[in-house]
A protein has these predicted regions:
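Short acidic, glycine/tyrosine-flanked loop/strand segments centered on an H-E-D-like triad
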Residues: 70-94
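Extended, compositionally biased alpha-helical segments that mediate assembly or anchoring
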Residues: 234-267
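N-terminal "assembly arms/tails" that initiate or stabilize quaternary assembly
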Residues: 1-73, 221-222, 226-227
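Glycine-centered loop/turn motifs
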Residues: 40, 51, 57-64, 210-211, ...
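Glycine/small-residue-rich hydrophobic helix-like segments
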Residues: 191-234
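Alpha-helical scaffold segments that mediate packing/assembly in large oligomeric complexes
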Residues: 88-155, 262-266
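Extended, solvent-exposed, turn-rich assembly/linker loops in the middle of proteins
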Residues: 126-194
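Ser/Thr-rich low-complexity repeats and stalk/linker segments
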Residues: 267-344
Length: 344
């Protein structure tokens, strides 16, 4: 009979315990189990915005347009995240802790994978304050944080539950910039915590890029769980090698932009509108190759274009002479780039 030192039940329970503990500590996203009860491997997320047509009107004069609801839709596909580790019977006998260490590493790598995906989604935030992470001007970074919080407050006045996520390089800059303004609050102590600014706990993560940092509430990012943590074992009886696979099936998505603000560097490439002719039904232009969307505004209406290799085009209501066209390009992890207004 083979010498199996850890049963499947014990290994499965160890992995779940390690992973669930770490995920429950996440300040940056929350879980949703709705996919577990549904068939299919894709989900469409719609983000709605209503335009503002509230205006002062003179006697006998009314509004020229209506308040309309626009939305953007993004499709996400469920993915399987898998890790694999192995050990020999002899290794486990020499030092039993090696198994726990390997399993702990798998759980940590799983969490790190989800964290990287969450940060990639954070980079799509549209409430952005431009920040160079280099200025030595007094109160520069503190003022940027306050401006970012103001963007959140405009739609969500409650600042509780927010955390600022920064990179290691930003940590050095922030400590120099803020000095004593970086308050250390005992109640906020956790892994990566370096202090609080403007009442917001600051946490460092190696997964965060140097070009942006994020002020985020868990409501902004959702982990859609398709299947919980599962483990599978294999064993080479001849070499006495034990192999364990760990899997989690789901997807990470930015689901509520009202709960996140980003401080980010400027894009290096301009957004440009190609002037359309009178009667045109499309508006086109160029932007940075890494842009994921361009929002075009004509009067009170907005349209969203999805760029390809730095070029974009979107169908619009027929444009007329005198129409003013604006466009803003969004790149993951960078401040939006506004195009020069074009008049038809």
């Amino acid at each position: 009979m083979a010498n199996t030192y850890y049963s499947h039940e014990i290994i499965n329970e160890k992995i779940k315990s390690m992973l669930d503990t770490k995920v429950s500590m996440s300040q940056f996203m929350h879980s949703d189990d709705q996919l577990a009860a549904e068939s299919g491997m894709k989900i469409k997320i719609q983000k709605y915005t209503a335009n503002d047509n509230i205006k002062d009107v003179a006697e006998g004069v009314g509004n020229e347009d209506y308040s309309e609801c626009n939305y953007t839709e993004e499709e996400y596909e469920v993915v399987t995240t898998q890790g694999r580790t192995k050990w020999s019977d002899e290794a486990a006998m020499r030092n039993p802790i090696v198994v726990d260490t390997l399993l702990q590493g798998q759980a940590e790598n799983m969490v790190n994978n989800l964290t990287r995906k969450a940060i990639a989604e954070m980079g799509k935030a549209t409430k952005v304050v431009e920040c160079d992470f280099a200025s030595t001007s007094a109160n520069y970074f503190y003022n940027k944080v306050v401006d970012a919080l103001a963007l959140i407050d405009s739609v969500n006045e409650d600042e509780s539950g927010y955390t600022m996520l920064i990179s290691p390089n930003q940590q050095a800059y922030i400590r120099k910039q803020l000095g004593d303004a970086l308050k250390y609050v005992e109640a906020n102590v956790r892994t990566g915590y370096i202090g609080s600014v403007a009442g917001i706990p600051v946490v460092m993560s190696k997964a965060c890029p140097d070009n942006a940092c994020f002020i985020v509430n868990p409501q902004a990012i959702t982990y859609f769980n398709k299947r919980g943590v599962t483990t599978e074992e294999d064993r080479d009886k001849n070499t006495r090698t034990n192999i364990v696979y760990i899997r989690k099936v789901g997807l990470v998505a930015l689901t509520d932009e009202n709960y996140i603000a980003m401080l980010a560097k400027s894009q290096s490439t301009a957004c440009v509108i190609t002037k359309p002719s009178n009667g045109a039904s499309k508006v086109a232009g160029t932007c940075g190759a890494d842009c994921f969307k361009v929002v075009v505004t004509i009067g009170s209406k907005t349209y969203t274009a999805v760029p390809t290799a730095g070029a974009w085009e979107v169908a619009v209501d027929t444009v007329s002479t005198g129409n003013k066209i604006n466009a803003v390009a969004y790149a993951n992890g960078y401040a939006p780039k506004e195009a020069t207004e074009v008049t038809v």
